[in-house]
Curated annotation (Swiss-Prot):
Pathway(s) where this gene product acts: Purine metabolism; IMP biosynthesis via de novo pathway; 5-amino-1-(5-phospho-D-ribosyl)imidazole-4-carboxamide from 5-amino-1-(5-phospho-D-ribosyl)imidazole-4-carboxylate: step 1/2
Protein name, UniProt field: Phosphoribosylaminoimidazole-succinocarboxamide synthase
Keywords: ATP-binding, Ligase, Nucleotide-binding, Purine biosynthesis
Alphabetical list of Pfam families matching this protein: SAICAR_synt
Catalytic activity: 5-amino-1-(5-phospho-D-ribosyl)imidazole-4-carboxylate + L-aspartate + ATP = (2S)-2-[5-amino-1-(5-phospho-beta-D-ribosyl)imidazole-4-carboxamido]succinate + ADP + phosphate + 2 H(+)
EC number: 6.3.2.6
Molecular function as annotated in GO: ATP binding; phosphoribosylaminoimidazolesuccinocarboxamide synthase activity
Amino acid sequence: MKTQLYKGSSKILYSAEEDFLLIMAFSDNVTLESGEIIEISGKGVLNNNISSFLMDKLEMNGIENHFIEKINMREQLIQYVEVFPVQVIISSVACGRFVKEFGMDEGYVFDKPIIDFKVRSREFKYPIVNEYQILNFGWLTRDEIKAVKEQALRIYDFLSGLFIGVGIRLVECKLEFGRVFNGEESIIMLTDEISPDNCRLWHINSNEKLGFELLENEPNKAFESYQLIADRLKEK
């Protein structure tokens, strides 16, 4: 019998039969900015399908990640990764905090994607943290920061092209990385998920928002947009 190891707002981690493997289950829950938890029936199934598909595509293109295989509609088998305490946010278009904090016009296209680091802490509301702080806190080494940034940009470039091919624009995404040890050596590996829960996705022609951006104000339309994204990716 599998043992629950962790329960977040949208995913649950369970033990697996083999060492260094875990089962990740996608729930229908989502936590709004207000802290309210709502349920979007069927969202977990779609996110499992979307993330499995994208992680598999990344692996085929030389990006190592924790995904091993999809087990069923809601669960996937993953490799254990010692996750870094920071998230990597890559933005190619002014959105979210760039509009709220800097007064930029939403939709302004940056010359190059911008990389931000945020602390992985809901308690402290995911504050921005810079590279000097990350180094001084001992969270990552200088070489690890460099490698994470290079991988993040490579992933973003690949995903952007893939989404453009199905008429969707990847505006911003949140990635998580960690270490996998092989004896005394370690490699950096992509972990968590890639889905409409952690990617800002807009319709390429109309800039209509898709995915999690609808959850706050138009939750009744959210599932339809998740389904649209999943259906578009099936074409690839």
